[in-house]
Each structure stands twice: as C-alpha cells, then as structure tokens.
Regions:
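N-terminal single-pass transmembrane signal-anchor helix
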Residues: 1-30, 34
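N-terminal helix-rich module
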Residues: 25-40, 47, 55, 59, ...
C-alpha cells in the first residue's frame, strides 16, 4: 500500500489554531507599531513645515500662517488631514484667493489624532511674523493621541 503525501485533518486544524493564536497576539502590536511610526512621521513633518514657514516669513518679510486644511486651500480646525502655509497679506489669518500658498502637505492620520493646544488667541493657526520670524501669540503644544493607547505624546 502506498502512502500519499499530505496533511491529515488533525494536523491542519492544529496548524490553523496556532496561526490564529499568533494573529491574535500580533494584531494589537501591529497597531501600536503603526501608531508609533505615524507619531514619528507627524513629528518630522511638523518640524519641517514649521521651520519652512518661519524661514519664508524671514525671507519675504511678511507674515506667514501655518494652519490645518481639509481642501489644501482654506484653513479649518482639523490638524489630522493636511497643513498649508501661506503669506497673509491682509492679516486676517484666513487664506484669500489672492494669497499665495507656500507649502501644503497631507497628513492623513489613521492610528491617532493630532491636536494643537494654543496659548493666547483662540484661532487654530500659527503666525510667523515677517520682521523676526517668531510666532507672536501663536505658541502652543502639538499632542498626538493614539486611538488604542491610554497615553498621549507631546510632539513640539
């Protein structure tokens, strides 16, 4: 009698059970890993665009606004989607059609949310003054909150 190579039903069931246990353990760790990657990327992108907005304000001697945006052209209050920086010629902290967009970047957070706690005026943007490049009345703290973890991380 010849033996045919293959797996018995018992071997297949045990293998699938072991794979399911490993997947159950690995899935939360994967989410935690992706949240930490998103945190590092957000911190890097924020630092780059804050420095770029400050540089543009000093270089052009005009106020530059860095703010969150949904459509990459107007400011809103959601820091999770994207950022824009523009020259604010009329000093109203909102982008008009004639004001040039200097940079825009999509953030698209999936594993957490980004918040900006501002000191001073309640508008949700950072203004870099053209004479010094300093963020007058715009200082604050960026905080990244993971959806699955209990602790928050201060970025900048």
């Amino acid at each position: 009698m010849f033996k045919t190579p293959g797996f018995t039903l018992l071997e297949l069931t045990i293998t699938l059970a072991i794979l399911m246990i490993m997947a159950t353990i690995a899935l939360p760790l994967y989410h935690q890993f992706m949240a930490s990657v998103e945190l590092k990327n957000s911190s890097r992108l924020l630092t780059i665009h804050i420095q770029k907005a400050k540089y543009d304000a000093i270089l052009r001697h005009k106020s530059v606004v860095l703010c969150p945006s949904v459509d990459l052209s107007t400011c809103n209050s959601n820091w999770d989607t994207s950022l824009i920086s523009f020259i604010d010629t009329n000093q109203n902290l909102q982008r008009e059609n004639n004001e040039e967009v200097l940079t825009n970047v999509e953030l698209a957070h999936r594993y957490g949310s980004l918040k900006f706690q501002k000191f001073g005026k309640k508008l949700n943007s950072i203004v870099f003054q053209g004479d010094t490049g300093l963020p007058r009345e715009s200082n604050g703290t960026f905080t990244y909150c993971s959806y699955k973890q209990l602790k928050n991380f201060k970025l900048i």
